[in-house]
A protein has these predicted regions:
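Short, conserved phosphate/pyrophosphate- and ester-handling motifs at nucleotide-, phospho-/glycolipid
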Residues: 35, 135, 200
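Hydrophobic/aromatic residues within the transmembrane alpha-helices of Major Facilitator Superfamily
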Residues: 28, 32, 65-66, 102, ...
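Juxtamembrane transmembrane-helix termini in multi-pass membrane transport proteins
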Residues: 13-87, 144-163, 168
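Selective transmembrane alpha-helices of multi-pass membrane proteins
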Residues: 80-109, 168-178, 188-213
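A short amphipathic helical element positioned immediately N-terminal to and/or at the very start
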Residues: 125-133
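Membrane helix-loop-helix hairpins that form the core translocation module of multi-pass transporters
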Residues: 51-126, 181
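Hydrophobic alpha-helical transmembrane segments in multi-pass integral membrane proteins
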Residues: 70-72, 133-143, 203-213
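Short, strongly hydrophobic alpha-helical membrane anchors
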Residues: 1-18
Length: 213
């Protein structure tokens, strides 16, 4: 028995929904692996607390949307042809994280809660985007992962938009979780003389993880 246009539309929708549901745990597990994004999120949360640091997962979320748009529009393959530009961007990100780590290690105050010149929310958001966008392996992982969850049935454009939006929500949830988890131990570190050293270690860890990519 042949399906009418309405039946085919419903079948296409269900197929796309199944693919999206399958995408969520796979993508979340990839993002949850320790790396430069996670280290930067933890470092910012330890230094500034959960409320201000929510701009970090927001920045990662926007970067995820950019990666998704690049891959699903076909621009990702084109960008990879300019490998030297990606390398330059990556090392700029590494140098900036090293700078943040150096500042944390040399900070005179050991009290995290009273930073004389706290990073602005805009700087936090743009730095998070920079950390994520200068990671070549993030783009490579996106190139390999996203096409697997686009079904043959249904509109490619509609599926791409849905997949990109879901990826952004998952990204915010995963890195928001890192920020929240780090904030839970922040109270114990606020008065510790090692507080800034610990924050600096996370920044340096993020730089090392990005450099190793």
């Amino acid at each position: 028995m042949e399906l009418g246009s309405g039946g085919k539309t419903m079948e296409s929708f269900l197929s796309s929904s199944d693919l999206l549901l399958g995408f969520v745990p796979v993508f979340a597990s990839v993002l949850a692996l320790p790396g430069p994004n996670a280290a930067f999120a933890v470092g910012q949360s330890l230094k500034y607390g959960v409320v201000r640091s929510l701009f970090v997962p927001l920045g990662f979320m926007l970067a995820t949307g950019i990666h998704a748009a690049m891959v699903l529009s076909g621009l990702g393959v084109l960008v990879l042809q300019y490998a030297s530009a990606l390398v330059i961007l990556k090392w700029l990100g590494v140098l900036y994280l090293l700078y943040l780590g150096f500042k944390a290690f040399t900070a005179k105050s050991s009290v995290l809660a009273v930073s004389p010149q706290p990073m602005s929310r805009r700087a936090m958001l743009t730095t998070a985007m920079l950390v994520s966008l200068t990671n070549p392996k993030a783009l490579l992982a996106s190139l390999m992962l996203y096409p697997l969850f686009i079904g043959e049935a249904g509109s490619y454009a509609a599926q791409s938009v849905a997949l990109g939006l879901v990826a952004m929500v998952v990204s915010f949830g995963v890195y928001g979780g890192y920020v929240l988890a780090a904030s839970l131990i922040r109270r114990r570190l606020v008065r510790s003389h090692l507080a800034n050293k610990i924050v600096g270690a996370f920044y340096l860890g993020a730089a090392g993880a990005l450099a190793a990519k």
